[in-house]
Amino acid sequence: RAEGSHGRAQQVQAERLQASADQLRAAASAVHATPELALFAGEGERGSARLLQAESLVLPHGCRAPLQLDIRRGQRIAVVGDNGSGKSTLLRVLAGQLPARSGNVQRHAPLALLDQQLLGLSGERSILDTVQAANPAADTGELRTRLALLGLDAQRIQRAAHHLSDGERVKGALASVLYADPAPQMLLLDEPGNALDLGALQALEELLVAWPGALVMVSHDRHLLQALQPTQVLQVSAEGWQWRDAL
């Protein structure tokens, strides 16, 4: 009975999260479309074709079944499963932030982990300063051009982050990751849309759709996952890992 109650509680929570996301999508249809955004050409497309391998990987928390991974350029993997099954733990192990229980991970290209904390750019520092700190050798004029392609004009990129909209902060935070040196060829997305307002959610979706690199993504927002066009779905449960072709 306890297991059944826990399962129903998880289902109710998932339905509430999806309902909230659906309300945001409905609101989006009632406002004007945002100007088209563009990433600087070539980002995420360079370097190794094989980005990451994991062999007999067992997580420290959640699912205890071993996992084999071979992630290549252009793949977009949606990781789905119940709360507590190990989705976020997997991303942190792949990023090197947590040690695996057993097995190994080989990273053949730069990657970055994006979560709601990183996307919550705040404080007195400007977007331009944040991006320059991530790529000190870059030409300032080139960085300004790249930020302009994201819809961030010369005035906005000089303002303190706490004076910007949520959407502008998301663009700035993503720019500091995507235009870093070295630039990532793969993004690990851990519930990136959580706690974002409508404008920020739209900006996040548009930029990630436009980015050509590989993605491994965890989100309760099914619409966001679908918009990012996963090439594969990795289902995790207490029994183990299972590959699917669609959500």
State each model region's role.
Residues R46-L247:
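ABC ATP-binding cassette signature C-motif
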Residues R1-H61, R72:
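Coupling and communication elements adjacent to P-loop NTPase active sites across diverse families
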